[in-house]
UniProtKB/Swiss-Prot annotation:
Keywords: DNA-directed RNA polymerase, Nucleus, Transcription. GO terms for molecular function: DNA-directed RNA polymerase activity; protein dimerization activity. Disulfide bonds: none annotated. InterPro entries: RBP11, RBP11-like, RBP11-like_dimer, Rpo11-like. Belongs to the archaeal Rpo11/eukaryotic RPB11/RPC19 RNA polymerase subunit family. Component of the RNA polymerase II (Pol II) complex consisting of 12 subunits. DNA-dependent RNA polymerase catalyzes the transcription of DNA into RNA using the four ribonucleoside triphosphates as substrates. Component of RNA polymerase II which synthesizes mRNA precursors and many functional non-coding RNAs. Pol II is the central component of the basal RNA polymerase II transcription machinery. It is composed of mobile elements that move relative to each other. RPB11 is part of the core element with the central large cleft. The keyword Transcription applies. It is found in: Nucleus. Its main location: nucleus. This is DNA-directed RNA polymerase II subunit rpb11. GO terms for cellular component: RNA polymerase II, core complex. GO terms for biological process: transcription by RNA polymerase II.
Length: 120
């Protein structure tokens, strides 16, 4: 078969960085972040979190090619901050949201188990 090995979808090549940033010299306070071995899931999550930030003028993402699992996120900020700070802030916020979601899930599973144990 011509299909690539499945591990190639998520294992980074030796020496490759997961995230790289390139400043846009044509637009003030703009940068492009490339995230390797990711897809629309992470691209849209980060974009939506960035859009909620008051300092963001533009945030968008694209996948350069359907068979390449890389996401390009382009960001432009106002003069109050820079794109790197905004991405770091959005990633911290997403991390807190996922931790909260995990804790809520575990709590609900425990409640369900406790109710089920009463009837056994």
């Amino acid at each position: 078969m011509n299909a690539p090995d499945r591990f190639e979808l998520f294992v980074l090549p030796d020496g490759a960085k997961k995230v790289t940033m390139v400043r846009d010299t044509k637009i003030p306070n703009a940068s492009m972040f490339t995230i390797l071995k990711e897809d629309h899931t992470i691209g849209n999550l980060i974009r939506m979190q960035l859009i909620a930030d008051q300092d963001i003028i533009f945030a968008g993402y694209r996948m350069p090619h359907p068979l390449e699992h890389n996401v390009n996120i382009r960001i432009q900020t106002n003069n109050n901050t820079n794109p790197l700070e905004c991405v770091q802030k959005s990633m911290e916020c997403l991390s807190r949201e996922f931790t909260s979601l995990e804790n809520s899930f575990i709590e609900q599973v425990q409640k369900k188990r406790n109710v089920a144990d009463q009837y056994i």
